[in-house]
Regions:
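Short C-terminal tail/terminal secondary-structure segment
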Residues: 2-7, 163, 170, 243, ...
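Canonical Rossmann dinucleotide-binding motif of NAD(H)/NADP(H)-dependent dehydrogenases/reductases
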Residues: 7-40, 193
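Conserved glycine-rich Rossmann-like NAD(P)H-binding loop of the short-chain dehydrogenase/reductase
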Residues: 36-51
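Short, small/polar-rich loop/turn modules that mediate ligand/substrate recognition or access, typified
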Residues: 95, 148, 198-202, 253-255
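Catalytic Tyr-X3-Lys loop
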Residues: 100, 114-133, 152, 179, ...
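Substrate-binding pocket helix/loop in short-chain dehydrogenase/reductase
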Residues: 105-113, 117-122, 175, 223
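Catalytic loop of short-chain dehydrogenase/reductase
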Residues: 118-120, 144, 152-185, 190-195, ...
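Amphipathic alpha-helical dimer-interface segment in Rossmann-like NAD(P)H-dependent oxidoreductases
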Residues: 123-147, 158-159, 191-199, 247
Length: 267
């Protein structure tokens, strides 16, 4: 029987995270590196990637590499797994984290519904959902070969519940339709692909609640008042979830959506 530390260890495995230079992505990469993995930072610009790669190498003494790619280009996204294997020798864990989020500065995005644009809707679905399809499809042969293949898709509470617009009243904030639709798609694609790729590859999702990013104090107060844990999330709240789903601690878990939202969605 394996012990807890052995099941949790990612030693000898390679983990890649899209959106890896961002707040949540870099936190997840550090957690995976601490658990023993070598890591690959995937993001849109090399200038964002390189500092994260250097920091992880220095902090954890592991191998770390970076790949710059625009996930709006699905063909480019599909080349990522091959590049990872060429540089790192293998691919065991894929965390699909990159996304346009509610605060992304897109035209026709963070607007009342009537002013949200079809073009931005299409862009969001391409990055938030189509890129996950392309990456999963291209990564599948390598993840099967690993013997420990795990995919973790990052969804959102707005993929499982409708928005409470009372949170946004009187503020220059909104809740884009394309964000909710794409994240709902992530949850269902997780279920679908978990049955298609089993038993060699496990596929699960993490659904984060709202993360504190110095939002308007009125929004923060409203959000916290309707959350049982009485606070917004912090990046470190997701460390346990990603290591659990990436590692053999969850070796009999697939097709699941782990909701980490402080109870926001249980009302």
């Amino acid at each position: 029987m394996s012990d807890f530390k052995m099941l949790m260890s990612l030693k000898g495995r390679v983990a890649a995270v899209t959106g890896g230079a961002g707040h949540l992505g870099s936190t997840m990469l550090n957690a995976l590196a601490e658990a023993g993995a070598d890591v690959v930072v995937i993001d849109i610009k090399r200038e964002y990637i390189d500092p994260v790669v250097s920091d992880i190498r220095e902090k954890w003494g592991c191998r770390a590499a970076g790949i710059a790619v625009d996930l709006e280009d699905s063909e480019a996204a599909a080349t990522i797994p091959e590049k990872i294997v060429a540089e790192m020798g293998r691919l065991d864990i894929l965390v699909n984290n990159a996304a346009f989020v509610g605060t992304s500065g897109l035209t026709g995005w963070n607007e009342p519904f009537e002013r949200q644009s079809v073009e931005t809707w299409k862009r969001a679905l391409t990055v938030n959902l189509t890129a996950i399809f392309a990456l999963t499809q291209a990564a599948a042969p390598h993840l099967r070969a690993s013997g420990h293949g795990s995919i973790v898709n990052v969804a959102s509470i707005y993929g499982i519940v409708g928005p409470d617009f009372r949170l946004y009243e009187g503020l220059h904030m909104s809740n884009p339709a394309a964000y909710a639709a794409s994240k709902g798609g992530v949850v269902q694609f997780t279920r679908w692909s978990s049955t298609v790729l089993a038993p060699e590859i496990r596929v699960n999702a993490i659904t984060p609640g709202g993360i504190f990013r110095n939002q308007d104090p009125k929004f923060v107060g409203r959000y916290e008042s309707r959350t049982p844990m009485k606070r917004m999330a912090r990046e470190e709240d997701f460390i346990g979830a990603v290591v659990y789903l990436a590692s053999d601690l969850s070796q009999y878990v697939t097709g699941q959506n782990l909701v980490v939202d402080g109870g926001f969605s249980v009302w």
